[in-house]
């Protein structure tokens, strides 16, 4: 069964809304791990809208499971990753005007650049995951650049408004997952997953880890982080 990476970006979003010192994402990560999180995920954006450099530095020192650093494939971010050495990096697309990551990374269209970044990071013993749509060409390109992982973008599945569309998107993810595993990639997934839609994705053969943030932090506002994480672990198990 898939494991759970808890994205704590939105703890930082609340903090940055008032430009203050609380709530602290580092404390949130501790509570998430106490609740059963298998990993902690943060996205250090170029505009620093939520997670800050200080957060990543402290999380590297305090996280006891594993730290997944989401970032754009820029020279600045590569330098930060090489300095901090997270347990792995997930390369994601990034636009300043977006509210959240809107789609998968286009590996096909920038294969030389992505290949260069993957090589730099993995030569420093930092495994790389690529956040992509479950399209055959993108999966093939991920193999070519020698990434260790892909993270399948589950946004269209999560946003499906009827059961027929949802099943079509789930089948698309299942096919992509199978293709990737056959090609030697390890497979994670994330984006838009909630307590109510997570199980079918978690149950896909070979699915390793689900990176989930907003729905957990939303639930945590009502019941606390530890309980919110425990409930998501139950949802992943289909309980």
From Swiss-Prot:
Catalytic reaction(s) noted: 3-amino-2-oxopropyl phosphate + 1-deoxy-D-xylulose 5-phosphate = pyridoxine 5'-phosphate + phosphate + 2 H2O + H(+)
Cellular compartments per GO CC: cytosol
Binding site residues for 1-deoxy-D-xylulose 5-phosphate: 9-10, 45, 50, 100
Gene Ontology molecular function: pyridoxine 5'-phosphate synthase activity
Pathway: Cofactor biosynthesis; pyridoxine 5'-phosphate biosynthesis; pyridoxine 5'-phosphate from D-erythrose 4-phosphate: step 5/5
Subcellular location: Cytoplasm
Record-linked InterPro entries: Aldolase_TIM, PyrdxlP_synth_PdxJ, Pyridoxine-5'_phos_synth
Keyword Transferase: yes
Site note Transition state stabilizer, residues: 151
Active site feature: 43, 70, 191
Membrane-crossing segments per the record: none
Binding site residues for 3-amino-2-oxopropyl phosphate: 7, 18, 192, 213-214
Gene Ontology biological process: pyridoxine biosynthetic process
Key words, A-Z: Cytoplasm, Pyridoxine biosynthesis, Transferase
Keyword Cytoplasm: yes
UniProt-listed Enzyme Commission number(s): 2.6.99.2
Coiled-coil intervals, chain numbering: none
Similarity annotation: Belongs to the PNP synthase family.
Subunit structure: Homooctamer; tetramer of dimers.
NCBIfam families: pdxJ, PRK05265.1-1, PRK05265.1-3, PRK05265.1-5
Function: Catalyzes the complicated ring closure reaction between the two acyclic compounds 1-deoxy-D-xylulose-5-phosphate (DXP) and 3-amino-2-oxopropyl phosphate (1-amino-acetone-3-phosphate or AAP) to form pyridoxine 5'-phosphate (PNP) and inorganic phosphate.
Protein name per the record: Pyridoxine 5'-phosphate synthase
Lineage start: Bacteria, Bacillati, Cyanobacteriota, Cyanophyceae, Nostocales
